[in-house]
Amino acid sequence: MISVDRLSEEQALGMKEQEWAGPEALCPGWQEEEVSDGEGPEDSGHPDPTAHAYEVLQHTLRLEGMPLTIDRTGQPRTGSGPLDMTVCVLGSPTAFLPVLLEGGTRYPGAMVLCLAPAWASRVPSETSPGSWSLLLSRGVSFEAGGCTALEEFVPPRRATYVTGTFGSEGSWEGELARDLDCPTGGSALLTRWLEDPLLSRWLLSARAGLPVPPTLAFITGLWETLPEEPEPPGVHLVRLQDPQGQESLVRDEVGAFLEGSSMQPYDQVAVRLSGWRWRGTDPHSTHRKVEGEAVAQAVAALLKGLREEESILLEALVPTARLPTLPPRSAAPRLPMALRICTVVCRSWGDRPQLCQVACTAGRAEVPVRHGSALPLGLDSSLRQWGLADAAQRQALAGQLREAAEAAMAALLAAEGELSPAQRGGARAHTDVLGVDFLLACVDGTLELVALSANCLRCLETCLLAEGMGHDVGQPAGDVPRLLAECLLHRAQCHLVEGKDILLIGAGGVSKSFVWEAAREYGLRIHLVESDPEHFAAGLVETFLPYDSREHRRDEEHAERVLEMLRARGLRPDACLSYWDDCVVLTALLCQRLGLPGCPPAAVRLAKQKSRTHQHLQRCRRGRPPPAAFSVPCRRLRSHGDVERAAGAVPFPAVAKLEFGAGAVGVRLVENAGQCHAHAAQLWHDLRADADHPGIGLGWGNAMLLMEYVPGTEHDVDLVLFEGRLLGAWVSDNGPTRVPTFLETAATLPSCLPADRQAQLVRAALRCCRACGLRHGVFNVELKLSPAGPRLLEINPRMGGFYLRDWMRAVYGPDLLLAAVLLALGLPPVLPSRPAPRQQLAGVMCLASEHGRALRGGVMAALQGLQRRGLVRLNPLFEEAGGRYEEPCLSVACAGDGPAEACGRLLGLCQALGIDSPQYPVGHFLSHFK
């Protein structure tokens, strides 16, 4: 907590007396003619609500400097198919306008605004019995640059995600969105559930553990939506069987509440009606705590009109913390003020809550500050104005607010998940965006955030108003439209892949077990081609196609045999992909023959053969710098004669490794030609066929290459490319390897490098991939960052292996596997345009030769216990096997707010469990991560 006593004596200008706008809401500029609280076109009272809504949209676009909507209804839009994404927003033309404009830029044509019930229809779902599909025959579509078009859709477009302004009871928006077969961001029922202050306050206290104003609630009926659990701190419930004749009970309960310990710090209370009808309204009355009889009378008076699922709340008026200030410049008395903090939180990747924006509104302290009662400010500016001069304290409070807002959404989503589909308005209805209001109070000398309630649109309106005001004075665009557009588009893409038939080539080992869980999560129908007829994944897929393709020099023949198997079973896959090194060329051949998106087989072959990759890049001399600048001198080795010739062209020390290898198996630093001869002889004797060491490319033979040794730090760059366009890039750092074998020891994500050095790595990786013809897919590029800049080690024409997919989800959110599936379907995946890490991960590899005995002796059980508590991340990699060509068996990682914290936790854990030793110095392996 932040202590009031620690506040700096430095103080900004004293708060001036302000004029208040009164009870009417000040909506954003794009809502000047719009009814607040999410009311749609039918609620406007206009004789032709659809025409009025369209006029409001044009007026708003004009004010925002956007081109007016083009009418294309005379030329119906045709050709929509099962892979077309349609994010449909029902109702108000302005409540989601910034999100629609952002989504139109990110994914042109996918965002569609429906202004009237006649523009859409419901038909029984073909995939979900008992549900409905929403078909759009007309809508306003959003394109890049703020362009919009009124369009007719022939045939009607099927919505893949639906949200809207689910306002008054029985509204057409709520009826159209009920029981749909696609994800629905809210519903009329969920809106009424979320907007009830009593219910949200109960959940914020009980499930999120947040302080709430002391509240006494009088309810009637059963209230089925209230959780069946003990009363949470701060909320006391009084159930009235009959609202009439309860004056004595009300008087006793009110008296006990006012005199109770929870009310000791407070002097005033408010009496309000709670329920859907009363959302966003002012309190019915406010009283001093000592006016017990008047308070009881106010409560009793409201009981007469109380409906089922409504309540009367008696709540403490929690004052905003009064911070030490310098004497004001004016001699006029300073009035007590109140501060309301609005937060907007969305369901981000992996269903994790993410705070999008914060805006604050100030007002006089006599009554609670309403949404829209004044122009908002940012959190930092508001805290400075309030007297919090210390920047570190403001930053700490902002961090506490983020944690509280995200915990609030997590609690509300968990409670929402306990509702039945009928209570939610459909099996696919979930809240994806919500607002949570807070007060800043002072409790026992420390600043404390007090949660008030949740809402659907009011916090969003306030935050969008704040963004619009910032735009007026030249501030860069805020995060709300971008984050919400990404949220909606991502949810729609997850629905698009449901039920798709995916031809997967190669199952991989234990390190790829996550694929089968992900397939269930995304609803994929996996048809697996695998060389091992006894593979454990055989029972986890839709179709298991055992076929021995390990001799990869015959991949052309294998492709024909696999096609025959597909035809014999009547399988027509929607996509074909592989994440297993050995199978990438066969996958490219199958994509080519099936007419499915993917990279050309020649490009994949070029990347798979390491010496050809570098020799090709050395011939690429166009560009500044050209791709040749990132290549490294190397020579192919198929005989000892090749070793002699390579020794004359490649300077020593050099690196000798398998031409088609994977997992650093057989990689070795050699100081001279003699060492290279010895290593080649040993490797050619030990590793001759795939059976000698499965999964490391021996199906192409055991040729080697000799490559110049590049000094510097090692890094992985994971790229997502759609038809040559870069959609996403992430850089991770590797620790110093165990020379001379170069086996990976440690890693961290995100990279500790400065942004400009990361940009060097990303651009080098991108130039190398494009130069090799890899323009469509998820690729993992290994580079060294030398004093002279990036140098390529190798390109893996598949997504990153080991722990990378898991770490990427934990740190940034997006799923590389889902991105690979979408690209294989021919769709550009929606990824964060400005990825921000949620945490730092640092991990260390475990080896059977070093740690096998400890792992079998109880260390593994201890690690699994820590993983269940969320204290470590474990990624099993390979079965325990030591020997000359050992691979890591386990990755152990810890999280922190930065590299120092993550590495400190990991080192302490490794020392405690015996993973760290003089022979395996974890501290040294982590030393690069600063």
From Swiss-Prot:
Its cofactor is Mg(2+); Mn(2+). Mn(2+) 1 binds at residues 782, 794. GO terms for molecular function: ATP binding; ATP hydrolysis activity; carnosine synthase activity; homocarnosine synthase activity; metal ion binding. Mg(2+) 1 binds at residues 782, 794. It comes from the Eukaryota. Pfam families: ATPgrasp_N (PF18130), ATPgrasp_Ter (PF15632). Residues 1-24 are annotated as: Disordered. Keywords: ATP-binding, Ligase, Magnesium, Manganese, Metal-binding, Nucleotide-binding. GO terms for biological process: carnosine biosynthetic process. Mg(2+) 2 binds at residues 794, 796. Residues 624-825 form the ATP-grasp domain. ATP binds at residues 650-716. Binds 2 magnesium or manganese ions per subunit. Mn(2+) 2 binds at residues 794, 796. Homotetramer. This is Carnosine synthase 1. It comes from Gallus gallus (Chicken).
